[in-house]
A protein has these predicted regions:
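A surface/extracellular/periplasmic glyco- and lipid-processing/surface-interacting theme
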Residues: 1-183
């Protein structure tokens, strides 16, 4: 009557396959991950530390000006940025042809590839897919069926990282465990 298509569910996400907010969050199966280190370049490094009390990943970044790693702070409330979900995706990133002087970067989203999903102090290796510009980004399980990853609700940070920096990416389990690195 008002021109609204009632068959469309406005609460169904088209971006990720989220666990419904009224269900218990799922526990990731890939192991513990209390520290995450994402290197984008020599001068751009992002870190996440799991805070079990808050149930969030706390974000910090390397600051050349400050001479070290500093908490990333929200200017609106002076609180350190914190995330329920951290998603790291690897793809080809290179200088856009003809724009070398401005260092304009081209990101190959059609590439698809490997990634990691972090939530609840845990990690799962994933794959991701994206076709044409009008197709959605899909996070899929690293299994033969490529089923959608069920992402827990909450604030999410997505890092798209150049394949050249994959060897510098790492995550660490709680104190007694050894480092795990991107494969």
């Amino acid at each position: 009557q008002f021109g609204y298509d009632s068959s469309i569910d406005p609460y169904k996400s088209t971006f990720f396959d989220f666990v419904p907010y009224n269900e218990e969050p799922r526990v990731l199966t890939g192991g513990d991950a209390s520290k995450i280190s994402v290197v984008h370049s020599a001068g751009y490094k992002t870190y996440f530390d799991w805070d079990a009390e808050q149930g969030k990943y706390m974000m910090s970044q390397y600051s050349k000006a400050a001479g070290g790693v500093q908490p990333s702070v929200d200017a609106n409330n002076d609180e350190q940025l914190k995330f329920d979900n951290v998603i790291v995706l690897f793809t080809d990133i290179h200088v856009f042809p003809g724009h070398e002087a401005k260092d304009l970067q081209e990101v190959d989203y059609k590439f698809g590839g490997l990634g990691y999903y972090f939530n609840g102090g845990r990690v799962e290796p994933i794959r991701w897919q994206k076709g044409a510009a009008d197709q959605v980004l899909r996070l899929v399980n690293d299994d033969a069926e490529l089923t959608n990853v069920k992402v827990n609700p909450g604030r999410s940070y997505i890092a798209v990282v150049d394949l050249d920096e994959a060897e510098n990416f790492s995550y660490t389990a709680a104190a007694a465990s050894a480092d795990s690195a991107a494969q």
